Amino acid sequence: MRNDTLNALILRHGDRMLQDAGWPPCVDMMPVSPEQMPGWLVACGSLDAAQILALVTHLCQPLTYGRAALLNASARRLTGTPARLYLYPAKRDTHPERLADAMTIHLPFAQEWLTAAECDDLLAFLRGSIDAICNIVREDARRLAAALKPSATPRLMDRRFGDWRILADEYDHENWLDEDDAEQLDAVLEAVLVRGARFCPVLLTVVNEREEDIKAAGVITDVLRFPGDPARRWLDRRVLREVMSEARAMPAQ
């Protein structure tokens, strides 16, 4: 299975967490290796002095007064200067061993406005915010991946109507989720991460029991299934009608 749906969900999750933490829209997430390691993200973007001050002030709110005062003082020293903070993927010949090593955070010419200790402290503080977000996303990516793949018990439904038997099984297939539809991505993220929903495609198979032959099959995609939901909640009637019509149109053996 390709990781298009999974990567779209992970990227949206990372961007939303950045925004919720107080990072400005000019900073967003980028995958490190979407095919090999979908859950690894790095932050990319740049902030001017005013944005740095606003961000540091916001991030310092839960800190003790002394620590917050030092960080805010460093950020204020940048006010009115051409200082600019850059975040970008680390330039490496191979993939990093640790997620924290995948991103570079850089404040060019910092010596003009800050001491080495002040600069190191400020950059470590901002990196810590990004690292915390990226690690949460990495952990949540495992839950998202599990929700998109067939479980150990993939059979969801087994119904018989006369000679016809209809089977529904979780199926290793790509969904067709629009990566630009933020509202839909948010709905899936909330359903999976908060409510424990499944988002794995479902294969509908129609079998003629008398002939012992599979007559038709179709895939239901982009459907959320919540724990305890009966089949009528997630069963796509359009796909069901299509496979039944195809099965009935098949000549008898």
Per-region residue spans from a language model:
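Acidic interaction surfaces
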Residues: M1-Q253
